[in-house]
């Protein structure tokens, strides 16, 4: 078992210390033997709350999967897996979910030999049933967004999964709401419940609410003016329908904005690319359905824009929870048409906001994303990527941003001003002796 240097993990994550919720959860998980239920608002840092103690309990010398983290969707599986990898603590991990072949994941599990696996209930059951994951080595079961797992109808799959793990020692459930009763099949043993929910607080007091009135029913021009005033700060624009997302995203692109489009109708790889571009600063606007309102742990989102009003109070809380994460401050804007009003369930003071009519240039992100068609399975590391781009692409290390190395490909943020130069100079070049595809991600 590795002796964890928690301060080193904090440095890797670019944070100074755990927040109060994370400290309390960590103490209970590490020093008690009971099951644990954590109720904490969206954006409070629940992923790190369970990962920090978990990595201290994992036996890093074992090749068995020791912890399963059940999540309601692939986005949260990918995001949580990325958080653990970013900790660089020597614990191997993998994510499993629908949308790609189970055989591909089977090969990945054999190759990586993860100690922690993040996955959706159905796909985890599939791998347990085929013995791609040994059911006998799993000691810890974490169910993140437990409330959403129940709402999505995963009861039977979760029951099957829990009952198939004979060596299970601890169950850790995390939820942003206290609305759901925990079913008997979870078999919690003297659970220690930690609630950080303040029933009087619908949104963080670090979020300022604004109303932007559009004089016409079509709110595109009001949105354009609003975004111009944000400069290059990171913004999510929420809509209720996929076709509306496509329409608004197209309008913004036609007006020079650098955006990412995100909804459930896109192919898995398109969704991954959209999130990478947004999280690494290559696109400063994410236009999305409520798919982006839960499970995405992207820091430094300054603004939330409700182009369409949220369909429920719960949906509103999760949307606004994307900003003011950790100890940051954020802003949420409601764009209302002539016959629209802000929903009654929105509590707190909502200020009127009038975007400036002053002519401004469309903000362009400093970074752009390139795709490199090699990854971990090709023995390509972050260091290899940096060396290749500096030596062959003519970049300085400071002109390279976030690098996401996947199994078969890599996304890299590079200086937008140098992207065309990089593409020209690396054309036909080899990375670690292998020719590969290098192209922009738009």
Task: Describe each region flagged by the PLM.
Residues 1-39:
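Conserved pre-motif I regulatory segment
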Residues 134-200, 346-347:
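Post-DEXD/H (motif II) to motif III coupling segment of the RecA-like Helicase ATP-binding lobe
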Residues 205-251:
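Conserved interdomain hinge at the start of the Helicase C-terminal
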Residues 5, 63-129, 137-140, 250-262:
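Conserved nucleic-acid-binding Ia/Ib motif block in the N-terminal RecA-like helicase ATPase lobe
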Residues 23-32, 47-62, 83-87:
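Walker A/P-loop NTP-binding motif
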Residues 294-309, 331-334:
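A short beta-strand element within the Helicase C-terminal
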Residues 285, 312-353:
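Conserved segment of the helicase C-terminal RecA-like domain
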Residues 104-108, 245-250, 258-289:
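Conserved helicase ATPase core of P-loop NTP-dependent helicases/translocases
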């Amino acid at each position: 078992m590795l002796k964890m240097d928690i301060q080193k993990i904090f440095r890797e994550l670019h944070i100074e210390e755990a927040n109060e919720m994370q400290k309390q959860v960590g103490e209970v998980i590490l020093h008690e033997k009971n099951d644990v239920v954590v109720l904490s608002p969206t954006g409070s840092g629940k992923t790190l709350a369970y990962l920090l103690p978990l990595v201290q309990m994992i036996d890093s010398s074992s090749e068995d999967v020791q912890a399963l983290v059940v999540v309601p969707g692939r986005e949260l599986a990918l995001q949580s897996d990325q958080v653990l990898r970013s900790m660089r603590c020597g614990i191997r991990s993998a994510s499993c979910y629908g949308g790609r072949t189970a055989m591909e994941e089977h090969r990945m599990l054999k190759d990586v030999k993860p100690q922690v696996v993040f996955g959706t209930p159905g796909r985890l059951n599939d791998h347990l049933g085929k013995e791609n994951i040994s059911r006998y080595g799993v000691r810890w079961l974490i169910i993140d967004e437990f409330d959403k797992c129940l709402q999505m109808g995963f009861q039977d799959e979760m029951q099957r999964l829990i009952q198939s793990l004979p060596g299970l020692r601890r169950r850790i459930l995390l939820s942003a709401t206290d609305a759901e009763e925990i079913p008997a099949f979870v078999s919690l043993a003297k659970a220690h419940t930690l609630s950080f929910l303040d029933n009087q607080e619908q949104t963080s007091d670090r979020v300022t609410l604004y109303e932007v009135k559009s004089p016409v029913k079509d709110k595109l021009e009001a949105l354009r003016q609003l975004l111009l005033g944000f400069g290059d700060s990171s913004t999510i624009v929420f809509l209720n329908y996929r076709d509306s997302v496509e329409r608004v995203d197209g309008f913004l692109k036609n007006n020079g904005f650098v955006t990412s489009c995100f909804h459930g109708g896109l192919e898995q790889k398109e969704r991954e690319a959209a999130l990478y571009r947004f999280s690494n600063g290559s696109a400063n606007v994410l236009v999305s359905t409520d798919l982006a309102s839960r499970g995405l742990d992207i820091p430094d989102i300054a603004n939330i824009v409700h182009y369409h009003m949220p369909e429920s109070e719960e949906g509103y809380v999760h949307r606004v929870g994307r900003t003011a994460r950790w100890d940051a401050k954020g802003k949420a804007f409601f764009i209302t048409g002539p016959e629209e009003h802000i929903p009654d369930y929105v509590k707190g003071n909502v200020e009127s906001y009038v975007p400036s009519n002053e002519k401004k240039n469309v903000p362009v992100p400093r970074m752009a994303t390139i795709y490199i068609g090699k990854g971990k399975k090709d023995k390509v590391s972050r260091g290899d990527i940096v060396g290749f781009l500096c030596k062959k692409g003519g970049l300085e290390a400071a002109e390279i941003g976030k690098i996401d190395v996947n199994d078969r490909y890599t996304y890299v943020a590079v200086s937008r001003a140098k992207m065309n130069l990089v593409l020209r100079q690396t054309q036909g070049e080899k990375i670690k002796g292998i020719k590969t595809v290098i192209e922009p991600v738009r």
